[in-house]
Regions:
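Small-residue-biased structural context
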Residues: 1-146
Length: 146
């Protein structure tokens, strides 16, 4: 059986790779490719965030009763990630490389810090708190990033 940590960390790495592809395309001035790459990143990131917010976090909260702990903090950070994605989408549409690349640095730092908290704390907590049946249900209900 896969662990929560292994499965969700894999999604982080997939999103990281897509984000790097989009950044490289913007830096190269290849706006068509940048649009495709960033759209793929945004779609995959939204799928990942939804997997957490609608499947993993509720299972963890139901099992532990912790509704105002780490999952609340992660949800708040998800709001910031979504805002940056919206701004960066606009930058690609306007072909504003300087603004995009500035936001890209902010997004990269945010994602690194966010992923570290999840991978080194929250996912392990989920693996410990959820029994095998609940873990299997979470992993079964997840949507693939594509």
């Amino acid at each position: 059986m896969s662990s929560i940590n292994t499965t969700f960390t894999k999604q982080h790495r997939q999103c990281d790779e897509m984000f790097a592809d989009a950044e490289a395309a913007v830096a190269a001035g290849n706006w068509q490719q940048a649009g495709q790459d960033f759209s793929a990143f945004a779609t995959s990131m939204e799928c990942h965030l939804t997997n957490e917010e609608e499947i993993l976090f509720p299972a963890f909260e139901d099992k532990t009763g912790m509704r105002e702990g780490p999952t609340m903090i992660m949800r708040d950070e998800h709001i910031h990630i979504r805002r940056l994605i919206n701004e960066m989408t606009s930058d690609i549409e306007q072909q504003d490389a300087d603004h995009y690349l500035g936001l890209s640095e902010t997004m990269l730092i945010l994602m690194q810090q966010h992923n570290t908290k999840e991978e080194q704390m929250l996912y392990d907590m989920c693996d410990r708190a959820l029994g095998d049946d609940a873990k299997d249900q979470v992993l079964h209900n997840m949507k693939d990033l594509g």
